[in-house]
C-alpha cells in the first residue's frame, strides 16, 4: 500500500504534471485552456486557466475517487484527526446538508439550536426531518445568542428520545463555544449522532491554545469551511466523519446534489491548504491569536466599543471562546454594527465580514498582517470621533426565537400568499427572511410571525442590512401560509 505523508499534495502535483504535457483538449471546458476566452486569461492568468480541466483518468473523479483524490482525502482525514474526509466543492452549505441528509429521513427528529445557518434548515426542507429547537440564552448586553446549554439539551433528549441526531454550531460566527465534549458524550449515551457545523473552526484542531475541535471531541460528522480560515479558495470545504459513519453511504448522499463537473481549482486549493495546515498550522494560528488579541486590546482602549473574548465564559452557555474571532459590540458609540460595517467599507476601504444590529465581525486569519490591524483600529477610532451619537433610537440586537408551527418542509411546499410585513403579524411564514451575512434566518418556513420580529426586520432594513430569502427583493412583502378552508 502506498505510504502517504503530509508533505504531499496529490491533486496539485498531478495538475503540475499535466501542465507539462502537450495534451490537445477535445473535452470540456470549452475555453480550451483559455484559448477560447482571452479575457478570462487576462483576469485569472494562464496558469490558473490552464489547470481548469475536466475529470480524466490521471486526475481521478470526485464522485468515485480511486487514486489522487482518494489520497488527498486520506491526507485530509489524517490532518484533522478524522476517520475519513470528503473534499467538497459546493461550500460548507453542501457539507452541512450532507450531514443532515445522511442521518435523518422524512419524519425523523433532529435536535438543534434555532440560530443555525440557513443551509441546515434548507436540509430539513429537502429531507422532511422535524426540528426540535433548543431555546438559546442571549447575552443581555451584546444581544447575541450564546451556546447550547447541557441542561437544555438533556431535557430535549429526555422529551424526544427518538431523535436521530443533534446538530451543534461550534464555534458560532461570534466565537462562542459550547461544551462540545460533554454534549457529544450525552448524545452518544442516548444513541444519537453528533453533527457539528464547524464552518468557523477549520483552525481549531491545529493548536491547543484554541477550543476543542469536533473530531477531537468525538463528534460523528463535522462540516469545515477551509476557505474561511484554512486558506483555500471560496466555495471549497471539507466534510469530516468518525468511525461510526459509513463513508460509502455518505458519498452517495453527497453525490445526490454535488456537481459531476468538480472544479480542480477548488480541489487543488483544498489539497495545498491542507498541506499548509498540517505542516505549519500550529505556528500560523498562534500568530493569528496574537494579532487578534492585540486588535482586541487596541479597540477596547478606544472606548465605546466592546471587543469581547473569554470573559464571557460562564461554564453554562459559554464554555469556551475562539479568540481569533474579532467580534465587536458597537452600540456603545450609538451606531449599529451594520452602520459601522458600511462606514468601514465606504469611507475607509476596509471590508469586514459582517455587521448586525449590535456587532461587527472582523475575520482574522493566516493572511492578515499587523499593518492591516493598525488600519482597522485607526478607522474605528476615527468613526467614533466623527460619527458617534447617543444611540437612543437603537433597538437591542437581541436574538428572537420564533414559535415553530409547521415543519420546514410542510410549510415550504404549502400554498402561500403575499402580505405586507405589517399585515403578516400572526401568520405562519412560508419563506426565509435573513440578514446575509451571517445567513441565520430571522424567520424560516413554518414559524409564527410576531410584532417583535417584524419590528426587527424593519429596523434592520432602515439601517442598511442586506436582507434576503424573500420572493420580494425589497422585503416589503412576505409569503405566508394560506389557511385551509373547512
Predicted segments, located by residue:
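Short, glycine-/Ser/Thr-/acidic-enriched flexible segments
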Residues: 33, 173, 228-229, 244-246, ...
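Conserved N-terminal alpha-helix of the aminotransferase class I/II PLP-enzyme fold
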Residues: 49-94
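Conserved C-terminal alpha-helix-loop-beta "cap" of PLP-dependent enzymes
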Residues: 294-469
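N-terminal "arm"/small-domain region of PLP-dependent enzymes with the aminotransferase-like
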Residues: 1-67
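Charge-dense polyanion-binding interfaces
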Residues: 466-486
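Conserved PLP-enzyme active-site core in the AAT-like
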Residues: 5-16, 20, 40-43, 64, ...
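Short glycine-rich or small-residue beta-strand-to-loop segments that form or flank ligand, phosphate
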Residues: 59, 86-88, 166-169, 327, ...
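Structural signal for conserved beta-strand scaffold positions within catalytic alpha/beta enzyme cores
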Residues: 87, 133-135, 224, 354, ...
